[in-house]
């Protein structure tokens, strides 16, 4: 009895499941290739009837079937696999073709039949012309604005490289900015059955990752341009002193600090040129004001300006000496008037200048101050020696006066700070 699922030739009864010829005019007439090529006729079927080739995909194309030849179905799966997985991914290609083929068999069959075989010789020319055109400009020279000149490597020692986690040959750090940026694409994979929405979503992930890489490189360039790594290691102070040709004023330092957030939008040279031009502008304005002052004083030649400056310096020197002499007399008179209220009291000659100022400001007589000072120092020494003592300050000494005197004695070094 014929097995179910198999097809047989109606003329010779041979199995025709892999490949058979079906008559399009007669019903249930299917012939094997041998009977069809011999022009077999049976019943109402004639050799000149139309026919249809029915391929079951199981007939052998390459090699004898007994020796494991490749069927047409396997060939079709092989071509689909190499289009989907790419040349060289033999493991996935073998799994796609079927469990009966190993990766080694898939590789040997493809190389022998499609590269070194007749198909490869007919499709692949002996000499492949170079169709790639280099449209980039040379990396050096002024006529290459499209390419950035690579930055020189950092001049740091091996120990400093290990401290920073810096790899000079790759110009990378162990911990980069936005360290987890690669997680955006680490799980992406291009599948053969992805729809348009999934493809656009994966492209969006790749675009986000590219923007993160650009931001990482931008920060590297800023750090290299402004020498932030040597500044972190404390090696840029001597270089700055050598590079600067003039002393930076306090106003310029404050302005540099205010403009620091804008450093990322300009190069270091552009910022240095900006401040240098601002300094030149300031010097030019000062020179213009000086020339205008000469003109107001009737000087129209540079030779006359030297005599004018010498006379002006002499005049200012005389005025300064006169003011200095007057201020000295005023200080002496002021000091005498300041101590006039206590200079005739007993104990005034025992006080230092600072103590005289203190007693005058507190309106405290020298004798009372000496008494309070003696009691406070005595109590302090007894406490340091471990002798219990109870402070017995005079009744006329309130809390404000006590605090002022204690602070004064502490600042002068008579007692320690913990005692106050």
Swiss-Prot record:
A zinc finger (ZZ-type) spans 4-59. PANTHER family: TRANSCRIPTIONAL ADAPTER 2-BETA (PTHR12374:SF63), TRANSCRIPTIONAL ADAPTOR 2 ADA2 -RELATED (PTHR12374). The lineage of its organism: Eukaryota, Metazoa, Chordata, Craniata, Vertebrata. Pfam families: Myb_DNA-binding, TADA2A-like_3rd, Tri-helical_Ada2b_C, ZZ_ADA2. Interacts with GCN5L2, SMARCA4, SMARCE1 and PAX5. Component of the TFTC-HAT complex. GO terms for molecular function: chromatin binding; transcription coactivator activity; zinc ion binding. This is Transcriptional adapter 2-beta. InterPro entries: ADA2-like_ZZ, Ada2/TADA2, Ada2b_C, Homeodomain-like_sf, SANT/Myb, SANT_dom, TADA2A_B-like_dom, WH-like_DNA-bd_sf. Residues 305-335 are annotated as: Disordered. Zn(2+) 1 binds at residues 9, 12, 32, 35. Coactivates PAX5-dependent transcription together with either SMARCA4 or GCN5L2.
């Amino acid at each position: 009895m014929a097995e179910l699922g198999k097809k047989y030739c109606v003329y010779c009864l041979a199995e025709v499941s892999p490949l058979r010829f079906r008559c399009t005019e007669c019903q249930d007439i299917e012939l094997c290739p041998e009977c069809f090529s011999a022009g077999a006729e049976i019943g109402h079927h004639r050799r000149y009837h139309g026919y249809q080739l029915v391929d079951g995909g199981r007939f052998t194309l390459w090699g004898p079937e007994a020796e494991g030849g490749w069927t047409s179905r396997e060939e079709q799966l092989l071509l689909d696999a190499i289009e989907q997985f790419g040349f060289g991914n033999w493991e996935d290609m073998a799994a796609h073709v079927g469990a009966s083929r190993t990766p080694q068999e898939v590789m040997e069959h493809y190389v022998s039949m499609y590269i070194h075989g007749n198909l490869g010789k007919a499709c692949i020319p002996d000499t492949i012309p170079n169709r790639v055109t280099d449209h980039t400009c040379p990396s050096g020279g002024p006529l290459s604005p499209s390419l950035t000149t690579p930055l020189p490597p950092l001049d740091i020692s091996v120990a400093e490289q290990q401290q920073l986690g810096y790899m000079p040959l790759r110009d990378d750090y162990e911990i980069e900015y936005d360290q987890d940026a690669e997680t955006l694409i680490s799980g992406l994979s291009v599948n053969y059955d992805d729809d348009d929405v999934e493809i656009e979503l994966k492209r969006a992930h790749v675009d986000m990752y590219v923007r993160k890489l650009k931001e990482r490189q931008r920060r590297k360039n800023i750090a290299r341009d402004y020498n932030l790594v040597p500044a972190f290691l404390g090696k840029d102070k001597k270089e700055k002193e050598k590079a600067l040709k003039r002393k930076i004023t306090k106003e310029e330092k404050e302005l540099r600090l205010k403009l620091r957030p804008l450093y990322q939008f300009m190069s270091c040279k552009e910022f240095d040129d900006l401040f240098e031009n601002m300094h030149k502008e300031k010097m030019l304005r000062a020179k213009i004001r000086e020339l205008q002052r000469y003109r107001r004083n009737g000087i129209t030649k540079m030779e006359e300006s030297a005599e004018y400056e010498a006379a002006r310096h002499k005049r200012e020197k005389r005025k300064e000496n006169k003011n200095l002499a007057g201020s000295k007399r005023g200080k002496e008179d002021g000091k005498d008037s300041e101590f006039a209220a206590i200079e005739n009291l007993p104990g005034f000659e025992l006080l230092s200048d600072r103590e005289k100022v203190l007693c005058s400001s507190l309106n405290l007589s020298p004798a009372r101050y000496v008494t309070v000072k003696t009691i406070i120092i005595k109590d302090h020494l007894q406490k340091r020696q471990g002798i219990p003592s109870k402070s017995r300050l005079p009744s006329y000494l309130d809390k404000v006066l006590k605090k002022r005197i204690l602070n004064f004695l502490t600042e002068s070094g008579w007692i320690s700070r913990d005692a106050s």
